[in-house]
Amino acid sequence: SLAVDNHMICTVILNGKRFFLDGTEEYIALNDYAQRIQGKQVLIEDGQNHMIDKIPEFAAERNKVNMLHKVNITDDQLSGSAVLEYNGESKISVQSVYAAIKNDKKAKSLSDFARSGNDNIDVSNISNSDFNDRQKPLQLKFDFKANNQVTKTGNELYVVMDWEKDFN
């Protein structure tokens, strides 16, 4: 069917290496490829000849989100710092959403994003890497205070760590 074969990309051959450029991917890094075209066969026009190649495939690890939280418990309140790092498809998703937000709402949106929409979390000192740098991972750093995340029962503390509610 033509429906599966109607996506055009550009191939640049530089110093014997092939780079596949997809104009529909606004934030993708050079030498990185959207998951939807990875592993697909490509037909490359070369004057009167043609070449057949395949878009490289990457392991899921390439799209990893790293989250590092350093947490303190003081008076039944969590506080600390966090570093979130986005790679591959997850990075592109964050970049696309951020670019679509009006400039006067970007700071609030970053704050909402950092606290995962959880009203019990206050964030401050937010900093981020360059949203336009396609070659490096995207990082978001911030300090936080989390209310209503610690329950004390006798000598035991029960701590809510799944702020994004991934496991609900």
Where are these regions (language model features)?
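A sensor for short, sequence-defined functional sites
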Residues: 2-168
